[in-house]
Amino acid sequence: MIFLKILLLPFSLLYGGITAIRNYAYDKGWYKSYTLPVAVVCVGNIKAGGTGKTPFTQLLLQQFAGKYKTAVLSRGYGRKTKGFVLATAASTSAEIGDEPLQLYTHAQGVYAVAVCEDRVAGVEKLLQLIPDLKLVILDDGFQHRRINRDVNILLTEYQAPFYADWVLPAGRLREFRNGATRADAVVVTKTPAHAALLKTDNILRHTAKAIPVLYTTIEYGATRNEDGNYTWQPNEKAVLVTGIANPQPLVQYLNSRHIDIIKQFEFKDHYSYTLRDIQQMLDYQNANDGVKIVMTEKDWVKVVPLLRELNLSKGWYYVPIQIGIYSDQQQLLNTVETKIIDRLNRLTQHT
């Protein structure tokens, strides 16, 4: 593996060099960044692949959407549409992407969710539709520098921190590690239970200043479907369906609950399910005494319209997740809110 990385290193240097030149051009003002009349909080990473952005974004929404008129803007990775799309109750993952759809299912009218490849155009459209909009959360926008933001929150996985990785293709980084200097706070995700919080010094060596570092974990909720919660029996058999970057933590959780996974349908991240996929799972279910089929909530929002189309509901479930906090979250939340308030005050002074 190390030998392969060494072979790929010249390509990584080329890729990283191109992104470094681009960042330098933004730093010097040669590429224009737009300041829009709204507070902007960016949640992102410098590593390709899942780092747990969605549950952390939900945490921010829980904290701030009730205080400030808020919208989430995402690129909508994996969607089949183009341009600006505002999420509605009729939206599908094909229209807005699976993660924005998952965020919208929790919105309950408190915040708006939209997708647009051009983040500047997306925010401008949101301001047209919601004139009293105060806060925009940019989902996965760390490299999208055309919009000036008030807070840059960098996420990194505990088991695979950015400072121990290489730039693509030798590693998974989208840019050199010094991209972390743009962060105003770092969130360490997927921290194992009872893990020592020893990575802070390594993280702060790569940031521009002493900034808040928050350690979080993934907490799994009760298995459920549209009819309510389901209680597993000891050693009950199940079929697991996953279309996420790393299903292993979910597998470990189900095993810890003494659930016997007899089959796993494993798809790539952001996979778009088809009726043929559902039929294949259904055939396996019917051939195995109606064994329960369980999946992530991210997969569920894509699968449930197909289940309705086939008039299926019983025996299909998902495991919801939320973020758990291992370290003091107040310093980070105070940092974010202070910058939001400062931005809104400046906007008020100029109106």
UniProtKB/Swiss-Prot annotation:
GO biological process: lipid A biosynthetic process; lipopolysaccharide core region biosynthetic process
Pathway the protein acts in: Glycolipid biosynthesis; lipid IV(A) biosynthesis; lipid IV(A) from (3R)-3-hydroxytetradecanoyl-[acyl-carrier-protein] and UDP-N-acetyl-alpha-D-glucosamine: step 6/6
InterPro entries (alphabetical): LpxK (IPR003758), P-loop_NTPase (IPR027417)
Positions annotated to bind ATP: 47-54
Coiled-coil positions: none
Transferase is among the record's keywords: yes
SUPFAM superfamilies cross-referenced by the UniProt entry: P-loop containing nucleoside triphosphate hydrolases
Molecular function in Gene Ontology: ATP binding; tetraacyldisaccharide 4'-kinase activity
Keywords: ATP-binding, Kinase, Lipid A biosynthesis, Lipid biosynthesis, Lipid metabolism, Nucleotide-binding, Transferase
Annotated EC: 2.7.1.130
Keyword Kinase tagged: yes
GO cellular component terms attached to this protein's record: plasma membrane
Superkingdom assignment: Bacteria
Catalytic reaction equation(s): a lipid A disaccharide + ATP = a lipid IVA + ADP + H(+)
Task performed by this protein: Transfers the gamma-phosphate of ATP to the 4'-position of a tetraacyldisaccharide 1-phosphate intermediate (termed DS-1-P) to form tetraacyldisaccharide 1,4'-bis-phosphate (lipid IVA).
Family: Belongs to the LpxK family.
Protein name: Tetraacyldisaccharide 4'-kinase
Gene, per the UniProt record: lpxK
